[in-house]
Amino acid sequence: AKEEYDLNVEIIEFTDYVTPNAALADGSLDANAYQHEPYMQAMVNDRGYDFAIAGYTFVYPIGAYSEKYDSIDELPDGAQIALPNDPSNEGRALILMHNEGLITLNDPTFLEATPIDIAENPRNFRFREIEAAQLPRVLPDVDMAFINNTFAQPAGLSLDDALIKEGPES
């Protein structure tokens, strides 16, 4: 960044999704680059932040991982599914389940869907809403967990190993 744009950039890592926006709002950060637009908009609406999009990077697809099963067809009725508990990533996971035919959502375009928005759950999946950074840690205790790359990659998980995953257009 220094050579190409004459910018001094300091990279600061956070372990959750809320703190970077709070730091941006209180002036501790000048910019952040970690969230997709629906999540940013949810935070603006929920917390009254005055943010603007300065540019776009990319968002890694979210994947569903299991240490117990090799395919979604093996998931038993009543399987315990861990979802990220932030507004848009939880919606992304549920939309992916809807698109795979595992559940039916009332509105499959609603990016902030939660389990309350499930119209049909024919396999009686049980959902646990977990803080995203904790999802790799709970993976051994659930049947399947939706984990985005921010936390999957450091935990040694590869999107290639996901039972289901978003496409590159996500």
Residue ranges, per PLM feature:
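Short helix-initiation/N-cap motifs at beta->coil->alpha
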Residues: I11-A22, T109-R137
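Pocket-flanking alpha-helical
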Residues: Y17-G48, D70
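A conserved helix-loop-strand patch within extracytoplasmic ligand-binding domains
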Residues: A54-I103
